[in-house]
Amino acid sequence: EPVPLDIKVILLGEPHIYYLLSMYDPEFSELFKVAVDFDYRMDRTSGSQQLYARQIATLARQESLRPLDRYAVGRVIEHSARLLEDREKLLTHTRSLTDILREADYWAERQGHDTVTREYVQQSIDTRIHRADRVREHMQEEIRRGTMLIDSEGERTGQVNGLSVIDLGNFMFGRPSRITARVRMGDSGVVDIEREVELGGPIHSKGVFILSAFLGARFLPEQPPALSASLVFEQSYGDIEGDSASSAELFALLSALADAPVRQSIAVTGSVNQQGDIQPIGGVNEKIEGFFDICNMRGLTGDQGVIIPASNVKHLMLREDVRKAVEDRRFSVYAIDSVDDGIELLTGIPAGLPDDKGRFPDGSINRRVQQRLEHYSETMQSYAGKGSKGQPAGSGTPS
């Protein structure tokens, strides 16, 4: 028989689960009419950091952990911003922080200390990464042994070091990828080889279409295009998704068209729009650190660095060793706003600004690209004109 029941049921979970239940279960919204969506982040201000420090102390007491000194608390706050990839925000999800505190307390106990210091918080973070970085170590070994080809010095035409992020669930890391471009006269446009073999996702393909539109609008606004070009991620055997490499792909194309070598000591990340603006991307810290690790493994020269979108500067929460190398001028992080900024850094040649007629200064990168594309277009039109002087279509001996 039915039993009388008067209760309140409260569900806690991820927002996307709530959205799915509301979409697929018609009774769910009737049963759970009041929804509260808690934000997982908050602004990082002096006041919020004080509140955060109190919360850390409360968590330590609740877990019966040793107290943290001020430097340890500061390191936990830094790590919180790092988890969000935003130095202006703090994570409100306490479970991740509690795990760090427990492990830091363990290291303090092993050393016989009554207080958790910054050293033990850092050791907790480092050991958590070490337990999960087998794949990263394997990829770095492949690069070190020359199995995976990545240049970090010298110059190459039509070749740029792009950067990607591999997400293993509980650990993310960045890795460089060689992006190459080849160009010739033709009418096939820019061919994305990843898309042709169904390894490139829709967002990546969108990025290639955007850079194709940028090329045509900037350099040949009133002439038919006569370009056949190919873009590929070398030694890539899995799916590629996202548009964060579209600027690197565009730089490879510009280098090939201008016949201008690109510095291999600089890696690139950032998406591009049709106006040539460089747009922000995700995983900026992991990408910088991924290229830094390769350069550091081979020896830092002071000439190496990474180009990032200027709008990503507020997201920088780099590892301490990377920050130290930047401070000592042994490694650089360049923030750019436009395609022109990036191509000048990579080639050392001025990009050049157009005049009222859309012509770029002689000797500039943009002028060299413009001349190559105009040559292709004029040559293609001359071939078409010669063909039209022959027999009309349909003439000749019937079969």
Q: For the regions a protein language model found, what residue spans apply to each?
A:
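AAA+/SF3 P-loop NTPase mechanochemical coupling elements
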Residues: 1-13
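Short hinge/gating elements
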Residues: 14-17, 33-44, 54-64, 81-90, ...
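Conserved C-terminal "switch" segment of AAA+ ATPases
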Residues: 20-95, 110-115, 221-226, 259-265, ...
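Hydrophobic/aromatic beta-strand patches that form the interior of the parallel beta-sheet core
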Residues: 10, 34-36, 307, 334
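Generic, well-ordered alpha-helical scaffold segments in large soluble proteins
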Residues: 31, 55, 59, 75, ...
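C-terminal helical "lid" subdomain and adjoining coupling/linker elements of P-loop NTPases
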Residues: 62-68, 81-152, 353-358, 380-387
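Peripheral, non-AAA+ core regions of ATP-driven protein-machinery
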Residues: 183-199, 205-399
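A glycine-rich phosphate-binding loop feature that marks nucleotide/adenosyl-phosphate handling sites
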Residues: 8, 75-79, 96-100, 119-127, ...
